[in-house]
Amino acid sequence: IADNIGSKFIILDEKREVVRIILNHIYIDIANQVSSTIEGDLCSRDFSINSIAFLFDKKCLFDPLNGLKDLEISLLRTHSENNLLNDPLRILRCFRFVSELNFKIDFNLITFIKKNKGKLYLVAKERINYEIQKIVNGANALDAVLLIKKLNIFGTDNLSEDSFFLDLEKINYAELNQEEKE
């Protein structure tokens, strides 16, 4: 496909057969079907906006979870909490969507995040660091960081005392709060 449209091709996960095509700053991820049905695959994705497929045989989009509607209104919504629990890093990915794309997070997803934020300790620090870098470099970083603060994502009530998250408490929230008031 990449050769036919003159785009860049990157292997993201050779074992799971996931590749990315980049064309004019547009990223298209292509994955081999894992479930017995395309709907099963899409329903195992993290967010509805990532649960849209192009059916080559029918030349149309397949959107069983209404991801296109959520894209139109910039809403981040999940189909299944278990999909997020399979990789707790997805909790932080929510804030990256806020930071980079100015998405709003669905109320049910906020409730899930509050309930499960302590599971972030299960994720490798390097992966968390990558997401934090993406969050703080987004166009709406302040909104995302303030939401992270409001939901107490890195609060010590959820993490062990030797956690590297405790360093994040040193963020100058007073300065962030002042910027929010301006």
PLM region spans:
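Catalytic cores of the polymerase beta-like nucleotidyltransferase superfamily
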Residues: 1-182
